[in-house]
Amino acid sequence: MKTTKELLNFWEDQMKLSHTSSNYFFRKSPSHYHMMLLVMNAYKCNENLTVEELKTKLFKTSRPKSALMINEACEKGFFILEKTSNDQRKKFIKPTGSFMKEFEDYLKKLREISI
């Protein structure tokens, strides 16, 4: 029962955060949350994820909608796009430093609840 109450408190605290925060943005839809997990997984595994690969991996999301979501995440400062030296058309998507910290804090709180 304690864990359930802690989880409820955690969720309520997350929802109280500013609507401009990543918490709000990545919970807009399952596709937004999926995008966050794909980018962070690639980053944690030291893999390069291109914008095109991300668009393909986002299930049940059209390519135009995926592009809008990616652009919005970049505009809000959660992700950055890096061009490759080999092919200027190919762009890798990476989390920003500030978003990486938010994500780590989020995971830390989740771990504390589950222990």
Map each language-model feature to its residues.
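Short acidic, hydrophobic short linear motifs in intrinsically disordered regions
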Residues: 45-57
